[in-house]
Amino acid sequence: MSYFLSYCKAHGGALLTGYQALRAEGFLCDVTLETEGSEFPAHRSLLACSSDYFRALFKSHTQESRARVIHLHVPSAAGLQRLLDFIYTAWLSLSMDTVEDTLEAASYLQVTEALGLCGRYLERQLAPENCCFAANVAARFGLAHTLDAAERCIVSHLQELLARGAGPAGLLELNPTSLRAVLGAPDVARVPEARLLGLALAWLRQEPTTERLAHCTELLERVRFGLVPADVLRRVYSGSGLVLPARVKGLIIQALNYHTTPSRQPLMQGEQTSIRSPQTRILLVGGRRAREVVIEEVAAPQRAARGQVAAPEPEEEEEELEEEEEEEEWELTQNVVAFDVYNHRWRSLTQLPTPLLGHSVCTAGNFLFVLGGESPSGSASSPLADDSRVVTAQVHRYDPRFHAWTEVPAMREARAHFWCGAVGERLLAVGGLGAGGEVLASVEMYDLRRDRWTAAGALPRALHGHAGAVGDRGVVYISGGKAGRGEGGASSLRDLYVLGPEEQVWSKKAPMGTARFGHHMAVLRGAVFAFLGRYEPFSEIERYDPGADQWTRLRPLPYDRFCYGLAVVEETALLLGGLKWRDSRQVPTRNVVGYDLDLDRWEDIGCALPWAWSGLRCAVLQLAEGGDDEREGEVGEALDLVLG
């Protein structure tokens, strides 16, 4: 004898269809639901199967459980009608006008499937014009997933909502939980922090004020006061019209102390001073560039059909660049350009205080420091006279939080073609060419905490055109360069010098396999890499193992280059722009190549600099998303909001 089990997919639907027919006929209806004067005949069995409320009610031994008419405290008869239609048909009719009433009924009667459908409907309908409403509804009815989606929608469209006005956009009616989430979101983009502070203060001033002020601390502590201008902070502290809790006052005082000690700011970084929605960008700073029109934002050249057409061979590319060089005119530049290495886009970020060549850059606490270099002896408006440059000792610092330059105390000696780096709480400036063209062995150190330069242990010999890097535990490496004056004054060197964090005397280590000048170094996974410089016919790359004191030759770059910029992003060394030799001539190269550490392989990443550029210096910073034009009016608008 054989047995089998069959399943009918249509049975469930047929059962509901039968119940709906009975309901339409009023046949076998054994209970009537009443609200707002409207009555709805129904079947106890189906109600108990669909609603936790009715299941518990009908199981209880109370007079109401046996009553023919049950009075419900559902605020909307229309909402109850839609919910009963769902129970009998599995279809729920929803719109933004009816979803709240439907949720009222579903929540009261504990119809969990209807609650889930309403939540998913709100998520699918999310848009800037309704995201605040959706967040309030989701918070009211405990729809956690929908609430999270609505809050993310508010965060992503906050700039647009604030542009429409906090009141009309619904931000001032937002529930406190959602507002707290928005103010604390790390990925708020294109909204100055002062506007977030103004939004919080405007919300707290709304009626009922007493009830809202109970949320003052939990809201305002989410504002990053270190990103708010000092003038705004002072007005908030003394003239906001609100009684600020001690916790908030403490945060404001802490931020004011941050603003009044600029030299220590790189050492005072934390959540209160961290940029929201940070974007990793490579900054290309100064040097010489072709005299072309600056393009605000340049998309990288893309291969046709997403790579279906092969890129030109290196020889063809060099020939094209050589032809361009015939008409190339160079000038010293003040440009600082931000490069999005992930999306291959360029954006003009800011301008150096003066055009520079032979300068050095480093970062500390997400600040960019630009040190020394050669600048025009005349006005900055005539930057192309290569024979009238002076070596400077000036140091400038760029703050991406406020898009502002600050002058730092100048170095003890003017320097060009030197190396600088951040070591702990100090900046180190090593060697270079002095104001009179002399080659320097001196080393000086800038103490960020004390805001002054002091002499440090000098190099064993004077050097310029050398490279440097900071390794693990703050060990400084200096390699190559020349000891003589001018490019032809001496041969390139192979020497490697090392300075430990607590040492005053440089140690000489194993020399490089190739003499180098005007090259670059970088530390990747604890190893020190030396990349090619000028007059290197074989384009060889080397890796130094500090533990073994040994150099290893790696795969050479497919084609030579010099006067390029170097940056390291996610353990990938990127070489940007520069010059190369072609038929005994210097020609520009605008491409960007990356070194794959695991495969010991070079790869052209498929984008070009916005113009021919040499002598540039590169650094990696976290920048706020958006352009500088969005910062205009920040202080004035924020003060208006602070004063109500």
Curated annotation (Swiss-Prot):
Gene Ontology CC: one annotated term: extracellular space
**What protein is this chain from?**
Kelch-like protein 34
Task: Show the segment(s) annotated as Disordered.
Answer: 304-329
Keyword Repeat found: yes
Quick check: keyword Metal-binding in the entry? no
Give UniProt keywords alphabetically. Answer: Kelch repeat, Repeat
Comp. bias intervals (Acidic residues): 313-329
Q: Where is the BACK domain?
A: 131-238
Which sections of the protein are Kelch repeats? 320-366, 367-425, 426-473, 475-526, 528-571, 573-623
Species whose genome carries this gene: Homo sapiens (Human)
Q: Which gene encodes it?
A: KLHL34
Q: Tell me where on the tree of life, at the top rank, the source sits.
A: Eukaryota
The BTB domain is annotated at: 29-96
